[in-house]
Amino acid sequence: MMVVDSSALIAILEQESDAAAFAAAIQQADRLLISAVNVHETGIVLRARHGIAAADRLWRFLQVENDFEIIPFDEAQAREALAAFDRYGKGIDPKARLNLSDCAAYALARTMNSPLLFKGNDFTATDIKACI
């Protein structure tokens, strides 16, 4: 099982240089979880870059090409996300700098006791377990 952050999805869908590593990690997972907040963020980024039709590619990747479980943002995650922001939030921790969507991914990983697949250095400055 793994939780996937928006950054990893965007790397794959935008065919960034490290896309293959993220795609391989997703293919190897027996269960894929993503916060509804992170789906929303990914959709916004893709739409801003490629127009409204980019949402179709996102849904196809999540639900046809892969079997992602889109997890609603609930009270337990909200509490964990707020605690994460208090420790690692943008403007609080100069190394982690987590934003709202990052905190949602962090919270889902913590509440599900699962590693997180992400791109970049923000999560490496936290206590979250990384997938790769």
Regions found by a protein language model. Name each.
Residues 4-5, 34-35, 98-99, 132:
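Histidine- and aromatic-rich ligand-binding microenvironments
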Residues 1-34, 47-61, 125:
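Short, well-structured N-terminal submotif of metal-dependent ribonuclease cores
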Residues 23-24, 60-63, 86-92:
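Glycine/charged-rich beta-loop-alpha catalytic/anionic-binding loops adjacent to active sites
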